[in-house]
């Protein structure tokens, strides 16, 4: 027997939007106000469902908030559903279709009405192959037990889900294995579940899964950006103005290097460096799928960049700075010989001009297509930073974004005078899978997240994106780097 947990703390319209629900999916007529943007905490929300009565004379009842999924015969055989309603009441519902058992934990106010409704329905003549009508159509309908049961439960499912359950659905399995089924498909139907997700939890650990049907995401990706955390959709045109922060949960989504430069640098002050420097194929890397040079060309066309980092000088609230921004969209922000050379030249320029230095890190590590040439960039950049920091006593701030891993973490990512990380950033040297395969040990969930590493003292600050520019400005002035124009400090 498996146990299924439904968390109904979130509001109706999100689930309706995600699953495409605007009316009852299965049987007892439309649901009131499902297309309106209501306050989820309104008292009359409990009225928005039909009872188990007839279609023509429907009434409303608290009993009508049940549980369920589509294709009930395929999904439920011997299950216990754990439900929390929006008042915080929790209760369990046990259902065994084969043995005709339907139980609710004792003492809950839903029990009497819900059980009596269930057994009244179960004992109807057409479920027991009882009396037939003279109408051939009705006879066919009455004899179809699966269709009748499915339809009736589905109507309850629709009512409960639209009024109570959002996308944050937890499945607690009684077995040791994770459930591989997507509840969103059962809840929303095959055609309605695109973009929905579940969070599957067993023995204290949690994994988040999204629908594997990517057609709808691909079709509308020029309009919407899906949050990696809550799977909410964000309108692409306004996402940039919101600093790529998810409107639903505030999660820090990935940003391109150009957007980060625009966010950090004052208008009309950016002067790019070494834009014409491009990668070759120094070790003639062999690939059966795509030659290295062709892959570079492909990413250049896709991103509009020549390499995985942009470097240059500009002003931050009037303070002249040297800035390097890595772009994860270009080959995962991997560090090859060109990336290393551009960053080294930027550091040397900042050293000569006595400028504060910022490098925004977003990288999967050294670029394997360039072999040891990519690895030596770690030493080259670190050597340039040593002269910048130790000899010239200048100020360097790395900003670690998600993800920052591999050779970048092992070199200039962790050499700052003040190290700043973005919230929820994934920061590591080796990835979780590599560690587990190498050491044959399980890596705890969240142990490579910025918040956990901050508690261990790995860096100095976690700064939200909307506060980053002002925090950097304060740090620079604290270290005696002041605006060229004193009026700009007010901005």
From Swiss-Prot:
The record ties this protein, via SUPFAM superfamilies, to: ClpP/crotonase
Q: Where Zn(2+) is bound, by residue?
A: 227, 230, 246, 249
The free-text note explaining how the cofactor binds reads: Binds 1 zinc ion per subunit.
Task: Cite the CoA carboxyltransferase N-terminal domain residue spans from the record.
Answer: 223-491
- Name any one GO molecular function: acetyl-CoA carboxylase activity
Q: Which GO BP terms sit in this record?
A: fatty acid biosynthetic process; malonyl-CoA biosynthetic process
What keywords sit in the KW lines? ATP-binding, Chloroplast, Fatty acid biosynthesis, Fatty acid metabolism, Lipid biosynthesis, Lipid metabolism, Metal-binding, Nucleotide-binding, Plastid, Transferase, Zinc, Zinc-finger
Q: What's the cofactor?
A: Zn(2+)
Location of the region described as Disordered in the Swiss-Prot/TrEMBL record: 28-56
Q: Which reaction does it catalyse?
A: N(6)-carboxybiotinyl-L-lysyl-[protein] + acetyl-CoA = N(6)-biotinyl-L-lysyl-[protein] + malonyl-CoA
Predominantly, its location class is plastid
Q: In which pathway does it act?
A: Lipid metabolism; malonyl-CoA biosynthesis; malonyl-CoA from acetyl-CoA: step 1/1
ZnF locations on chain (C4-type): 227-249
Localization: Plastid, Chloroplast stroma
Q: What are its GO cellular component terms?
A: acetyl-CoA carboxylase complex; chloroplast stroma
Question: What Enzyme Commission number(s) does the record list for this chain?
Answer: 2.1.3.15
Keyword Repressor included in the entry's annotation: no
The answer to keyword Zinc-finger applying to this record is yes
Its family remark reads: Belongs to the AccD/PCCB family.
The protein's assembly and partners: Acetyl-CoA carboxylase is a heterohexamer composed of biotin carboxyl carrier protein, biotin carboxylase and 2 subunits each of ACCase subunit alpha and ACCase plastid-coded subunit beta (accD).
Free-text function comment from the UniProt entry = Component of the acetyl coenzyme A carboxylase (ACC) complex. Biotin carboxylase (BC) catalyzes the carboxylation of biotin on its carrier protein (BCCP) and then the CO(2) group is transferred by the transcarboxylase to acetyl-CoA to form malonyl-CoA.
Q: Under what name is this protein listed? A: Acetyl-coenzyme A carboxylase carboxyl transferase subunit beta, chloroplastic
What organism, scientifically named, is this protein from? Answer: Daucus carota (Wild carrot)
Q: Which lineage is the organism of this entry classified under, starting from the top rank?
A: Eukaryota, Viridiplantae, Streptophyta, Embryophyta, Tracheophyta
Q: Supply the gene name.
A: accD
């Amino acid at each position: 027997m498996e146990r299924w947990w439904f968390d109904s703390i979130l509001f109706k319209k999100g689930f309706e939007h995600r699953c495409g629900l605007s009316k009852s999916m299965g049987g007892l007529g439309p649901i009131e106000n499902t297309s309106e943007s209501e306050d989820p905490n309104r008292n009359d929300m409990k009225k928005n469902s039909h009872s188990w009565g007839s279609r023509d004379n429907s009434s409303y009842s608290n009993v009508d908030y049940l549980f369920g999924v589509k294709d009930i015969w395929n999904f439920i055989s011997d299950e216990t559903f754990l439900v929390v309603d929006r008042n915080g009441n929790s209760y369990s519902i046990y259902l065994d279709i084969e043995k005709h058992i339907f139980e609710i934990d004792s003492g809950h106010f839903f029990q009497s009405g819900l059980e009596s409704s269930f057994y009244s329905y179960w004992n109807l003549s057409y479920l027991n192959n009882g009396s037939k009508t003279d109408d051939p159509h009705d006879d066919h309908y009455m004899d179809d037990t699966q269709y009748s049961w499915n339809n009736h439960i589905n109507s309850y499912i629709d009512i409960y889900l639209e009024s109570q359950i959002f996308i944050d659905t937890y499945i607690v399995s009684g077995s040791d294995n994770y459930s591989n089924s997507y509840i969103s498909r059962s809840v929303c139907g095959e055609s309605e579940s695109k973009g929905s997700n579940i969070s599957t939890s067993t023995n204290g650990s949690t994994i988040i899964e999204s629908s594997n049907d990517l057609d709808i995401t691909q079709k509308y990706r020029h309009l919407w950006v899906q949050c990696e955390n809550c799977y909410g959709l964000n309108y692409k045109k306004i996402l940039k103005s919101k600093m790529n922060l998810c409107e639903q949960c505030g999660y820090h989504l990935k940003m391109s290097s150009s957007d980060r430069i625009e966010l950090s640098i004052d208008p009309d002050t950016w002067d790019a460096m070494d834009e014409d420097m491009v990668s070759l194929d120094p070790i003639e890397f062999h690939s059966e799928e795509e030659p290295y040079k062709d892959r570079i060309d492909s990413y250049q066309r896709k991103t509009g960049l020549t390499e995985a980092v942009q470097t240059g000088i500009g002003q931050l609230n009037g303070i002249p700075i040297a800035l390097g921004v890595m772009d994860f969209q270009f080959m995962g922000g991997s560090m090859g010989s060109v990336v290393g050379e551009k960053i080294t030249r930027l550091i040397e320029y900042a050293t000569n001009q006595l400028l504060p230095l910022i490098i925004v890190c977003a990288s999967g590590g050294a670029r394997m297509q360039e072999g040891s040439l990519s690895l030596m960039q770690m030493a080259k950049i670190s050597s340039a930073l040593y002269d910048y920091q130790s000899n010239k006593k200048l100020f360097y701030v790395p900003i670690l974004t998600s993800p920052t891993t591999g050779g970048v973490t092992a070199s200039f990512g962790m050499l700052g005078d003040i190290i700043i990380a973005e919230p929820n950033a994934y920061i590591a040297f080796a990835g979780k899978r590599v560690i587990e395969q190498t050491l044959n040990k399980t890596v705890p969930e969240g142990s490579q997240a910025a918040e956990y590493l901050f508690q261990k003292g790995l860096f100095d600050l976690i700064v939200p994106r909307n506060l980053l520019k002002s925090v950097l400005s304060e740090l620079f002035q604290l270290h005696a780097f002041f605006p060229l124009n004193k009026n700009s400090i007010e901005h």
